[in-house]
From Swiss-Prot:
Enzyme class: lyase
Stored Pfam families: DHquinase_I
Pathway: Metabolic intermediate biosynthesis; chorismate biosynthesis; chorismate from D-erythrose 4-phosphate and phosphoenolpyruvate: step 3/7
EC identifiers of the protein: 4.2.1.10
InterPro entries listed in its UniProt record: Aldolase_TIM, DHquinase_I, Type-I_3-dehydroquinase
Name of the molecule in the record: 3-dehydroquinate dehydratase
Gene: aroD
Amino acid sequence: MIFFLLEGEREIITEICGSIIESNEKDIFKTLDKAVDLDVNYIELRLDVIENITSKKATSIIEKIRNVTDIPIILTNRTKYEGGYFPSTEEDRIKILMDNASLVEYTDIELSTNENLRQEVIDNANRTIISYHNFEKTPSSEYLENVVNSALNVGDIAKIAVKPLNIEDTYVLLRLLMEYDDLIGISMDKLGSYTRILGPILGSPVTYTAITDESAPGQFDVKTTRDILKKLKNY
């Protein structure tokens, strides 16, 4: 059982983020309309899946989104190494983020990014999510604590998403959420899917949800997430 981790009553303060993962503008705005209807708190715009993405194209899309809604944006341009699809060079990937970071509320940049390139993005961003993804395993608590500390030393929020190989791995993630504020923690796949609900109870500031198709293994859709959180504590 996992509920030994819960100590007293905890207020659920998490925000629901709907991920937009579409390859073309037509589908981006179809999904955006759904996100608006679902009243998400944030939208994550995944630049790495957009065909022929450039800085100029990213700027245009962001400006068009602003004409539709004032929902805060989390801008992501995920590297292939951490589960993304950006097809070009690391310098191009960073330039697109750097050129557009000031236009959005949050910019997601991987902790593994070259330190100088990462800092260029941070310097241009309003606020940052420093992320770490491991699709092979859940590292030790000590290792992940170092990851979180490193991320929070340079950014506003830390995000870790790891693959559990057994149920005990999911407890590692939950314990981290108990220890840290400003940590988004996700244990992936069906085995870890329950952490997407317990995470908000333990203080995770954002929970990522699917507007249409899931963007990560084990991810719930917006309606399911909100319904469960409401039942748990009048969310």
